[in-house]
Amino acid sequence: VDYVEAAGQLASDIDGWLSDREGEVLYELAKAVPPGQTIVEIRSWRGESTVWLAMGASAGNGSSVYSLDPQGEQGPGVGDLKETYPAMVKNLSNAGVRDGVTILSSSAEVAALRRRRNVGLLCMGVFQDYDAIRSAFVAWKPHLLAAAVVAVKDCDQPGPSCFVEEYLRQSDDFSIVRTIDTTIIAAYDSCVHYWVIDSVDSGVCQHCGRRRTFRALPRWGKAAGAGK
């Protein structure tokens, strides 16, 4: 049985914006999560990406999948999230993965405070607003384990794109490892960096060889509030 193909067929019946290539990468990332670590997805909408994650987890080490969707919020381009909950439950049940997914109907910030979760994969989706994705990420960053992976979807939109630039690409803590269509994958960097910075504010770590710029970053928040 080609489980990746099976996941794609099941996910294809669900409304969403994920490409097959993005779904396959989420599947492989979920499959690779080590035993004892969890997968957290924030804002799945109707469960398209959740199916990929749950089937990948099942094919791998059986990691628990938590999907956070605050009910009753209005999302630009996605409508009332309260109306998507029944559809999400139905879609996960139809795909045969409902028992492997815990749906948390609360905001990312509230859910992060309720219980410590050892997160090996954090998937950020259906965000258009910079401040919203930043707030959710800041709340869940303390739950990330060493070498955890962060996947940010919809990076063709200003909010997620600017978030990735400021909090992942220009951060000492993360390295961008892959870009697939509109999804950007980053790895939690365990290196204790020792930066040597040149005259044009470009630095290289003497331990791992990573390079980054130390030029002042623009203020993204105000400019990145546009939705889809």
Regions found by a protein language model. Name each.
Residues D2-D13, G23-Y194, H207-A224:
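S-adenosylmethionine/decaboxylated-SAM
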Residues L18-E22:
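Phosphate/oxyanion-binding active-site loops and adjacent basic polyanion-contact surfaces
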Residues S202:
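Residues immediately within or flanking Cys/His clusters that coordinate Zn2+
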Residues I197:
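Alpha-helical and His/Cys-centered functional microenvironments
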Residues A226-K228:
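Low-complexity, charge- and small-residue-enriched intrinsically disordered regions
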